[in-house]
Amino acid sequence: MLTGTVKGKQRQQVLSGLADGSINILVGTHAIIEDQVLFQHLGLAVIDEQHRFGVAQRAALWAKSERPPHILVMTATPIPRTLAMTLYGDLDVSVIDELPPGRKPVLTLHKYDNQMASLYAGITQQVNEGRQVYIVFPLIEENKKMDLKNLEEGYEQLCRIFPQFKLSKVHGQMKPKEKEAEMEKFVTGKTQILVATTVIEVGVNVPNASVMVILDAQRFGLSQLHQLRGRVGRGARQSYCILVTGYQLSEDTKKRIDIMCDTNDGFRIAEADLKLRGPGDLEGTQQSGMAFDL
């Protein structure tokens, strides 16, 4: 395994094993893309959560072998450029369009800022029934340039609103061990509410969590919203995703919120994203928008 936290002698052993071919399978993060990571012969590259990688990053991985490797990319919501590539025949597609046995589709609701009292009542009911809750903020700290809710102030406020419950918080500026400790509390059920940023977008599996609240949801793209929603609905109980916004929304934002409330189908969401943002540049690195040759 190779991640950014693998250091010193252990890291050197991994790099040497890759270079001489004694390591057959490597599991890692973006750390695999670094220049000093060399493979004797890379035969297959599998990228999970493909939307988290840029075009240049993926190309850097392909370039680590003299002969191009076989490639498998996986994602719940293909980004516009990827969807366009499937349409033009550059990618073969396999689709898993069924939930695992026993799971129910997540019910997605849109609420406005002035409906927080009813939202808090719903959270209280879910936790009293033994369930757990995610509450996601777009910012860690207050930003004078953006009138958005932030995690640090929000966490303190939520502790006052829910004094009867235990809360954890995680964000990208925390030290890895501190973040792991807070996550462990939530995973093991020691805390009932996890206050977080988008660091929980991938790799979090808590079947007992039944509510995902996304504050200032207008600040998130369709892929992010769908990925965050995917943190709930992993058990047999009915789960809910609550998108909270203000009243003043652009037409594109309204369309994003509507498609999220209408479907749990990642491909329908990806198609809507393609229509809203454009396919990007199939010959370049732009992954959305309209590409023009001048």
Give, region by region, the residue ranges found by the protein language model.
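C-terminal accessory region of SF2 helicases/translocases
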Residues: 236, 240, 248-294
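Inter-lobe coupling/hinge segments of SF2-like helicase ATPases
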Residues: 1-258, 268
